[in-house]
């Protein structure tokens, strides 16, 4: 399942974030790549623990934990602290699959990467190239969203970032360990939750709503890992 989550940050917020990122000191993006990924990764990144990355990441997570679409689709259990990157001057990241488990620097906590997310801080017209290409059971998707919007997709997906040939592409990326490990099960629960919400709005007193909601929670109880 690939999902577009619009408006995580407002236009004004994105403008302030981008202005701060343009003044930041960047490091080689290979610092957080695995052995194979490092061969394919050609970008810049704020180091883990950088104060600006922590500030932006905390604001992102605060918004996402209050975002019904993210909560319904991801069913989050743990989140790897968001990282910030920049692609410019031909920067790219060839096809790869993210590491299955990530461990934040200086933390004993491990996060299984069930879901990957990219939140854009640059508008599509700000740069040439830089499309996020995601290959999975839903086919090949090319993603280039407005600043402030986010894409959520399975961590098992083969994906890449095309070379940026003009301008700069600023974004944040992170991983989520879901309460439900299997993508097809999460997708089923997401569709069912959406149907329940629509029925609650359209026919709030329908007696079948109680049974349908009960079925949702029984499936969640069967599949959840805590």
Swiss-Prot record:
What EC numbers are recorded for this enzyme? 1.14.11.-
The record's section on Pfam families has: 2OG-FeII_Oxy_3 (PF13640), PKHD_C (PF18331)
Q: Which cofactor does it need?
A: Fe(2+); L-ascorbate
Q: Does the keyword Membrane apply?
A: no
Q: Which InterPro entries match?
A: Oxoglu/Fe-dep_dioxygenase_dom, PKHD_C, PKHD_hydroxylase, Pro_4_hyd_alph, Pro_4_hyd_alph_FE2OG_OXY
- Binding locations of Fe cation: 96, 98, 159
- State the free-text cofactor note: Binds 1 Fe(2+) ion per subunit.
Stretches assigned to the Fe2OG dioxygenase domain: 78-178
Residues the record lists as binding 2-oxoglutarate: 169
Q: What GO molecular-function term can you cite, just one?
A: iron ion binding
Q: Which UniProt keywords apply?
A: Dioxygenase, Iron, Metal-binding, Oxidoreductase, Vitamin C
PANTHER family xref list = PKHD-TYPE HYDROXYLASE YBIX
UniProt cross-references to NCBIfam families, sorted A to Z: PRK05467.1-3, PRK05467.1-4
Q: What's this protein's name?
A: PKHD-type hydroxylase PFL_0865
